[in-house]
């Protein structure tokens, strides 16, 4: 049989590459590839996925609907996606030493929403790190679901050390009687004491949940304490330090399995994104390799090198300091409260040099969040490109020199140094542009 001319035309269009189907979007995809290749990505929540993950996310798995869980789907034709999801779950269990894993959450925020639904009831009190002290919007921000559907209370950092202090958490827990205490953060440069937080939760009869989205890669590499032995539930994204696809997953004790499964599906989501779950499976495998541990070590080393440069006298002279005086993780928090430069200006200055970061509030910030008094600078993506101590020293000096000089910085000269680093460490060199 022969297709009609119109049907044949439709078939030809179906099989056409994007440069023919939609040149406008194709051009923008090429532009974004160029932006990532030619600059230095230092947003702490960003990273680059392996080529294998890109292949998963652009695969035929994007066509497959698979509501339910392996062996218990509401659709036929799931024999292969069942295997993929099972592999992802088992790899994550082994990697993190967890009794239960759910790899279906579309994002970290959706994973967190499922945790709330499983562990507490609407109106219950929850206690998390204040957003302007380094917490995440899903930890109780008033206009987020977590602050609208639950009675959200907050603990802050110690006003002298700017560190999370278990005694402050304990006092707030005794005052507020939370049903759940939340650990984890979005913009905090130190390691939390999960054991102490668990003891506080037990003292007040609260569940203990840790959102390890930012430091999951460090935990997987054995370079950061794991919250899994202490928390009732642990949630995470699969990108950030972990370097996988933009998505989420949940780890927990087996006793919460049924509630969490129901909270994810059908409580929060319908069909899972199987092309993304395949990418997560690949990422869990990668995270168990010596090469991954080396990358995480270089990530930590780079952050310490950056912090040390930003503590130098020329930077201090511009009223700039490093929050907590250093870092234990993949990011550095720059404090601009005493500088004439605000966070927006600092972000724009480094962007002009070819370095992408983000402005961020700091504790006791006198400026509005739209401009903020802080910069959050991460080192994960540079480690993925292959940076070592020498390269981190160079990029740290570029950032330090720019911030010390402020508006009088020689942006052209600094940009040339960034260009050289980007050229020396090519990103996706075998990935062809679409055009």
UniProtKB/Swiss-Prot annotation:
List locations, semicolon-separated: Cytoplasm
The record ties this protein, via InterPro entries, to: PyrdxlP-dep_Trfase, PyrdxlP-dep_Trfase_major, PyrdxlP-dep_Trfase_small, Ser_HO-MeTrfase, Ser_HO-MeTrfase-like, Ser_HO-MeTrfase_PLP_BS, SHMT-like_dom
Q: Which keywords does the record carry?
A: Amino-acid biosynthesis, Cytoplasm, One-carbon metabolism, Pyridoxal phosphate, Transferase
N6-(pyridoxal phosphate)lysine-modified residues are 240
Sites binding (6S)-5,6,7,8-tetrahydrofolate sit at: 131, 135-137
The chemistry this enzyme catalyses reads: (6R)-5,10-methylene-5,6,7,8-tetrahydrofolate + glycine + H2O = (6S)-5,6,7,8-tetrahydrofolate + L-serine
Taken from the UniProt entry, a GO cellular component term is: cytosol
Name the cofactor(s): pyridoxal 5'-phosphate
User: How the protein assembles, per its UniProt entry?
Assistant: Homodimer.
Q: What does this protein do?
A: Catalyzes the reversible interconversion of serine and glycine with tetrahydrofolate (THF) serving as the one-carbon carrier. This reaction serves as the major source of one-carbon groups required for the biosynthesis of purines, thymidylate, methionine, and other important biomolecules. Also exhibits THF-independent aldolase activity toward beta-hydroxyamino acids, producing glycine and aldehydes, via a retro-aldol mechanism.
HAMAP family from the entry? SHMT (MF_00051)
Instruction: Please report the name of this protein according to its UniProt entry.
Output: Serine hydroxymethyltransferase
């Amino acid at each position: 049989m022969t297709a009609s001319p119109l049907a044949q035309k439709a078939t030809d269009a179906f099989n056409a590459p994007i440069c023919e189907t939609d040149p406008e979007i194709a051009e923008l995809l090429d532009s974004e590839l160029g932006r990532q290749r030619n600059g230095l990505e230092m947003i702490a929540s960003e990273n680059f996925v392996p080529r294998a993950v890109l292949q998963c996310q652009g695969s035929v798995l994007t066509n497959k609907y698979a509501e339910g869980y392996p062996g218990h789907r509401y659709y036929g034709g799931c024999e292969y996606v069942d295997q993929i999801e099972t592999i992802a779950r088992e790899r994550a269990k082994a990697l993190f030493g967890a009794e239960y894993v759910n790899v279906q959450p579309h994002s970290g925020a959706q994973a967190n929403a499922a945790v709330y639904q499983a562990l507490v009831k609407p109106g219950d009190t929850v206690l998390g790190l204040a957003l302007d002290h380094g917490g995440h919007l899903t930890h109780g921000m008033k206009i987020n679901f977590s602050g609208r559907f639950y009675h959200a209370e907050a603990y802050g950092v110690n006003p002298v050390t700017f560190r999370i202090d278990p005694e402050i958490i304990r006092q707030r827990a005794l005052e507020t009687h939370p049903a759940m205490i939340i650990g984890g953060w979005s913009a905090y440069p130190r390691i939390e004491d999960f054991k102490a937080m668990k003891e506080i939760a037990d003292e007040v009869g609260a569940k203990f949940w840790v959102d390890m989205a930012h430091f999951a890669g460090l935990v997987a590499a054995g370079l950061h304490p794991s919250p899994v032995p202490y928390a009732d539930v642990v949630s995470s994204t699969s990108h950030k330090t972990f370097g996988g696809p933009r998505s989420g997953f949940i780890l927990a004790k087996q006793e919460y399995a049924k509630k969490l499964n129901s909270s994810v599906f059908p409580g929060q989501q319908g069909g899972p994104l199987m092309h993304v779950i395949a990418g997560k499976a690949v990422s869990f495998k990668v995270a168990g390799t010596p090469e991954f541990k080396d990358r995480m070590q270089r990530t930590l080393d780079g952050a310490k090198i950056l912090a040390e440069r930003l503590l130098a006298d020329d930077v201090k002279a511009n009223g700039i300091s490093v929050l907590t005086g250093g870092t234990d993780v993949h990011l550095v928090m720059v404090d601009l409260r005493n500088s004439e430069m605000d966070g927006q200006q600092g972000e724009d200055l480094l962007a002009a040099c070819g370095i992408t970061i983000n402005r961020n509030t700091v504790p006791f910030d006198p400026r509005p969040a739209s401009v903020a008094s802080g910069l959050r600078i991460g080192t994960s993506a540079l480690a993925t490109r292959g940076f070592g101590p020498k390269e981190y020293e160079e990029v740290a000096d570029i950032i330090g020199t720019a911030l010390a000089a402020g508006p009088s910085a020689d942006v052209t000269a600094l940009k040339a140094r960034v260009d050289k680093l980007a050229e020396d460490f090519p990103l996706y060199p075998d990935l062809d542009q679409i055009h």
